[in-house]
Amino acid sequence: MEKSLFVFISGSSGVGKNTVISKLMEKNENIEFLRSHTSRPPRVDDKKNVYYFVPSNADFEKLINDGDILEFDYFSDHYYGISIAEIKSQAQKGKIIIKDLTVLGVSNVKELMRNQLEIVSVFLTADKAVLKDRLIKRKTDKAEIKKRLKEYKHEQNQMLSYEYVVYNNDLDKTIAKMEAIINSSTNHLPILALQSCQQAHDKKIEKYAAKLNKGKSLKPIKVVALDGRIYLIEGINEYLAHLKTGKHINLIFTENYKNIKPEENNLKEFEKLTNLYRK
């Protein structure tokens, strides 16, 4: 049976995680939401198939102590978490399973289930001014807005641990990027290149490979989404160093590029390069 792809999304409050998830689920019936367990009482406005309700905090704590909960958070006097049973159940459906998680939650799931699940992590962010405007429109308390904007810089520093970074300044463009990520991940499609392969240099590749092998992070590699595929536009040497070492890199979607069509010769040359350096 085909395994499911788990797409975990993190980001600041107000960045639009729930909106993006809802839109993706509307457009693709193969995408399902990963249900959480919670100890808070049900609400009238709760959406269907979002939570499994646990009677009390004590009952939830028993699940934790019994090792049934993979990842959890305590918020507003109640527990929220994902059960191992739910993860394993969804893993065999051959679906795209999507869920918003905290940075710590994504880290925990990766650490504990990396060898059992196919996981892609996305850090959803937005320009600070856009985020502030959204919080104001949501009638968020001024003190809370100030607090969240203060946390913005710290949250931005977390994005390097994710496979992809997507700026949600425009919803339609964000959905196109997310669809490219999902398409590439489910179909195991390689990243293609708009950047000229003539800019690939052995010495630079070796330098970046040495950094990665020492556990150092490289600057995010810039990519774009075109027709459901992911194209590299800057960072070819860093990307090839990643293939050579098998170490983690960070791909960030950008819109600051000239709208040029991929050149067939460059795509073929890039395929040769990736095959040469792929570990």
Task: Enumerate the predicted regions with their spans.
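Small-molecule kinase domains that catalyze NTP-dependent phosphoryl transfer to phosphate-bearing small molecules
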Residues: 140-181
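Conserved phosphate-donor/acceptor-positioning beta-strand/loop module used by diverse small-molecule
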Residues: 98-103, 115-138
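Short, charged/polar connector segments at secondary-structure boundaries
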Residues: 186-274
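ATP-dependent small-molecule kinase phosphotransfer cores
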Residues: 38-97, 103
